[in-house]
UniProtKB/Swiss-Prot annotation:
Cofactor(s) the record lists: Cu cation
Ligand binding (Cu cation 2): 95, 138, 512
Positions bound to Cu cation 3: 140, 453, 510
Protein name: Putative laccase-5
GO molecular function: copper ion binding; hydroquinone:oxygen oxidoreductase activity; oxidoreductase activity
GO CC annotations, alphabetized: apoplast
UniProt-annotated binding residues for Cu cation 4: 448, 511, 516
EC number of the protein: 1.10.3.2
Highest taxon of the lineage: Eukaryota
Location(s) in or outside the cell: Secreted, Extracellular space, Apoplast
Function: Lignin degradation and detoxification of lignin-derived products.
Enzyme class: oxidoreductase
UniProt-listed SUPFAM superfamilies: Cupredoxins
Organism, scientific name: Oryza sativa subsp. japonica
Amino acid sequence: MGTPRGLRNAGSSSSACRFLAAFAVLLALPTLTAGLTRHYTFNVQMTNVTRLCVTKSIPTVNGQFPGPKLVVREGDRLVVKVHNHMNYNVSFHWHGILQLRNGWADGPSYITQCPIQGGGSYVYDFTVTGQRGTLWWHAHFSWLRVHLYGPLVILPKRGEGFPFPRPYKELPPIMFGEWFNADTEAVINQALQTGAGPNISDAYTFNGLPGPTYNCSSKDTYKVKVQPGRTYLLRLINSALNDELFFGIANHTLTVVEADANYVKPFTAKTLVISPGQTMNLLLTTAPNPGSPVYAMAIAPYTNTQGTFDNTTAVAVLEYAPTRASATGNNNLPLPPLPRYNDTNAVANFSSKFRSLATARYPARVPRAVDRHVLFTVGLGTDPCPSNQTCQGPNGTKFAASINNNSFVRPRVALLEAHCQRRVVPLAFNTSVELVLQGTSIQGAESHPLHMHGFNFFVVGQGFGNYDPVNDPANYNLVDPVERNTVSVPTGGWVAVRFLADNPGVWLMHCHFDVHLSWGLSMAWLVNDGPLPSQKMLPPPSDLPKC
């Protein structure tokens, strides 16, 4: 089947090193779009913010936490000029944007660009092609995304509606996050130095607000106002650093209509689970005669970790209008019944409900034939402690994370500029790939939300235990599998995805738990140029940051 057991070094592949041949001729083709050009400016600066009665200076975009909402239409060109006024290096990723032929705008530091240094600037310039729905943007350097994130809403083209009944109104997007009283850069730096697990967050947040279940936080409660008997569109984004989250609204049923900016067959649920990096669009139908003026919206963690984790519940308020009821306390709020923190069955049942529309207008273009079969093991492990150091990981080791037992080491220059010397997996243009991600239990079974840059993929199968290459493919869904950019490898299980490698460039794939990313759970695909000018990478921009 040609399944690689280890990552291949692109330096040994002459075809891989030819993939940037377009640069030799610099085919600076104009970007054709019928949409508008929308300009935004990001001034990245330190700002004092107070939560849980703790004031600290955090990185922000334009002084906002969370950052500004970006709104475009399908087909628009988005130009974001970033000015870094901090001492930290920074880069920004436009999570879920395909960046066709334009990896220079993708954003992960040392993969597609060197980071923007303090005092420097860079313009992210890209066109949103063939996508509509809810995505988001975030920093992609160290743990800076704990504060640097915001929604990216892609409206359908003018004149195009939704493939579901038009809602009465759209509610503001809700971004789930984590708040640390400590400096998060100090948290991860200490963990990497000692080899121990990092300290956990102090609270979960709704749009940066912890809510009334935490001490000194009642005034920092996020509220959503609705009217009785209406249907609203609600966009959810899990921007938490290290936690998958359950979500529910007391006494309300939700209808899921989109996942990762891809429409799905609508289904109802009282409780959702959403992994870091994932987005969902919901229809919320309010009660015609509500029994209470206010209801709790709650998030709580899902995890099977053997270590410590933030086992708290954050609450926001759904407030029916007109009402003057106080929503700052939590004693009288009806709370939604969320599953127990380690309820893997609830997660599996929810995940199994996702199906693509698979209609003529929104087809599921899942590859039926496969050119390349790849099996990657993903999980946690340990590295030996250096001889001159005392380490605080298991049995005096250092925590590590890996794909196929290889922990990714951050390069000193961007892979997109020097990919021939780095460990990547090369793919010929237009290769159809089946990727099986198998979880391991070396340091305990955990789920791993894997995010792929540059592509969406179809989730054709998943299960518990070890993947069976003989029998499991017979149960694949090749008719209407869900299309996503982030999928969670089940705890103690596997997931199979398929995608078409039709986007030339170097594309990162990594666990969206930032602690696992910091420990090395990532890799990169190198997709070679195709034969046609329209299948080759665009040349680098003149202001590309230098390392």
